[in-house]
Regions:
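Hydrophobic alpha-helical connector segments
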Residues: 61, 76-105, 161
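Generic hydrophobic, amphipathic alpha-helix propensity
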Residues: 11-22, 37, 62-66, 70, ...
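Helix-turn-helix
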Residues: 25-57, 61
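Hydrophobic/aromatic-rich alpha-helical bundle segments in the mid-to-C-terminal region
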Residues: 4, 145-191
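Basic, amphipathic alpha-helical hairpins
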Residues: 21-29, 106, 148
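N-terminal intrinsically disordered/low-complexity leader segments
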Residues: 1-10
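Amphipathic alpha-helical segments used for helix-helix packing
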Residues: 99-123, 167-171
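Amphipathic alpha-helical packing segments from all-alpha helical-bundle domains
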Residues: 72-75, 103, 121-148, 155-159
Length: 197
């Protein structure tokens, strides 16, 4: 028999899965309505409000979950690729960006979530609401600190990079224009390498 916590986790997951399914299968890029989400998830409407303030809070949390999957997948692959090797920070960042772009290319369905949610989700991430991203975020801050940036400047650099990466990678991965995804990846790597020089 499932515990109360397991039931809560399951219901929250069902709501998020329903929202993701509705969002990625729809013809518009608008968040689904709460009624659509609870109907697909098979839960009462009141249950929705136990986990989310409104549909925008749901979309923010869904974005953070998908972002965490992307970052954690890229981190895992980067660690595997560089295991046992001494590498410069620039090579480490380039390998990480390679893996982020590979994930983006293989998971295009979640990209429309990114377009308009970067700044609100970044604020949530800074508040520590997304523990799955904390390790990657802290690693990036330390990387910039090693290169002479203050903590504030490091956080600002991460925000600027994420804010640039999200929308341009969406356009490139989904539409293939105005530049190909590989071109954007190379540009981001050059930009990051210059920041760390």
């Amino acid at each position: 028999m499932a515990t109360v916590e397991e039931n809560k986790t399951e219901k929250r997951s069902k709501l998020m899965e329903a929202a993701h399914s509705l969002f990625t299968s729809g013809s518009t890029l608008k968040p689904p309505t709460i009624d659509e989400v609870v109907k697909m998830a098979g839960v009462a409407k009141g249950t929705f409000y136990l986990y989310f303030k409104d549909k925008y809070d749901l979309m923010d949390q869904l974005f953070l979950k998908k972002l965490a999957e992307c970052v954690n997948s890229a981190l895992f692959k980067t660690r595997q690729q560089l295991a046992g090797r001494q590498v410069e920070d620039a090579e480490r960042v380039n390998a990480f960006l390679d893996n982020v772009f590979m994930y983006i290319d293989e998971n295009k369905a979640f990209l429309p979530l990114i377009r308009d949610r970067v700044s609100s989700c970044y604020r949530l991430m800074l508040k520590g609401r997304e523990a799955e991203l904390k390790e990657a975020y802290d690693s990036l801050v330390k990387l910039f600190l090693r290169h002479g940036f203050t903590e504030y400047e490091s956080e600002m650099n991460i925000y600027m990079l994420v804010s640039m990466l999200a929308p341009v990678s969406c356009d490139s991965a989904i539409q293939g224009e105005p530049y190909k995804l590989d071109e954007i990846k190379s540009g981001m790597q050059r930009l990051t390498n210059k920041l760390l020089a």
